[in-house]
């Protein structure tokens, strides 16, 4: 990057700083993996966002963490591949495209499958472009030369191969099962696509008559319309109330079908009446009970949520209309004995909002137990296991794997990977293969597509060229080093990538999984459309810049924890960047056209020089160690404290002494140290704030084209000086103590005062004498005395620091008579306040009627006034000493 400006602009403007830099990085190909065999590879594949719209704050957080990792590793000399890509997001994208078509007054059926898919691809191209623009705004160092999409030809080949191989191993089968069914979109849903909401419903209590006429058995349901498909009534085998009824039958009300009373341990004896209706075609638990007892499965609904011919006279009714009509009929028949209001959790489709129906359907499934077994066994092998950060999420993962159910992988959609299965038109024979049958005219392909998570589970290796195991990228960059993702998709995605990676590559797909939480608002609420508390990251970037947003997101919480988003804290980060900018301007204005090769750290150094270089070493060690542990918050805090406190507030101020002095050698050393420390600090900060660090670094004396490929700082033992650091700590303590004393008595720093320091021994005396110029510069004494045998003066403000005692005579600081009068007036004011609040708190009427928070507030005031009064009394006493 050519740079003709000697100095940075006067004001930090994030928009002008970030403008154009990303494109310059892309043109320089700094983010492209080189394949350099001399370097160790480091690989991350991006969790692919859905091509359904804009990225949200969760995406910004997730990708910022990945960018921090990959930028750091690139600077540390790794051959970094951060592979970008997007997910076709089957149902989500299809719902969006269908919604757009509805606005035009047409449906997907009007278009037909091929034309509809053309529309879906048009949508994908438009929104993929938006997502790339947003990635650029955040500053993500992605290798676009390797960008992938889950419906790419190569990835589709991988999907088909995996399906066929699992089918041939008997691990994919077609069968009936209860799935989450969305009647509005007419497709199966994964658990993650079901949103549970608290809904006001009811328990419908009914009497089912015993067929022999000897009485009835009472039970309750929240879905009375499903009783039309009941095939049994169940009780617990050890429930003494019903043991005598096991094996008998009841007559299903309205329907008149005779069904058995069975015993099953699924029933909870102590819940309700201890009797449950069993509807195997409309409830997952009932389905399992039905399998154990060989019960028939009677499906009483159509795919659109209307009742079918098995529902008798309710055939054709919407399921909820059927509920109303059936309840009325049950009441009239005297079967319904009570309707008990009941709030309960009901699943709704994330896409359509429709109430999800547990529904018996013929679907394709993956047999999970054998696959999960291998994944669980892997975690026993210390060198080969997947490491979860934080570690507690490994238990979450293992618990799910050990209690896993078969996975429904078919979806009744058009957008997605079409299932590679064909049915013979005459014989019904099923053919599964990566290629269509040779006599294709005699076969019909399965209309369904695969669950989006099926292709996503192959993402770490399909994106690198598998199933071609000789592909250069697959051989070099697999398995990947880290996956960064939220805890909400450990089950749906992380676990599936692990077992598919093991099954098809024989290796874990990634070494580490860094888990983060969810982005919440300042009140801790989940961001959602209904609450209206969502925040667009692009708006944050426009207002405060990507660097400020990134630093807040990456340092605002610990691994595995949720993040409370605060615009105020992003603004504070912007202020921090502004301070860095101003400090950098000061450094650059004092460089005197210094070239990179002129930076010389071998000259004689002051205690401040040695200290800042030692603190830089400590910061390099801390940042590097915490980055290796994924503790980005700790790394960021180390940098913040070093830059704000050590470099800006102390060293730059101390550097002004030699810079504005006459000693040319000292000036040169100071310039070199300023340039070196700022250069190293910008490198450490670069993964967090890529834009502003590149801008500043380009103005500094440097070698190389871009900070993105500059070497990561390392600790230099030759610049470590513990003694100088201790000396500096003493100086800082003295200066701070003097400033505190002046603030306490309202004496400005501009007023000169006597200052006496009693050193505890000759060594401290020598240190303070040698560094007295700093004390004179920052404490502004009219006279400075440093001795080991100093007698404490009368009427002086004092402070004790490690190794020394300070005295500032009061007569120099204040007019004693005026200060005494002022303090007495203060004391009188606090006496009145204490009396007022204590009188209020002793009033029994007030205490009895006032809210607890108000009383607590008054007690806090009392404590505050008492402490302030005591401080004033102490100050008055000090004046009399």
UniProtKB/Swiss-Prot annotation:
Gene Ontology cellular component annotations, sorted alphabetically: cytosol
UniProt entry tagged with the keyword NAD: no
List the Pfam families.
Anticodon_1, tRNA-synt_1, Val_tRNA-synt_C
Per the Swiss-Prot or TrEMBL annotation, the motif 'KMSKS' region is positioned at: 526-530
Residues given in the record as ATP binding sites? 529
Any single GO BP term: valyl-tRNA aminoacylation
Short sequence motif 'HIGH' region: positions: 49-59
Q: Which reaction does it catalyse?
A: tRNA(Val) + L-valine + ATP = L-valyl-tRNA(Val) + AMP + diphosphate
Tell me the protein's name.
Answer: Valine--tRNA ligase
What is the organism of origin for this protein?
Answer: Bacillus cereus (strain ATCC 10987 / NRS 248)
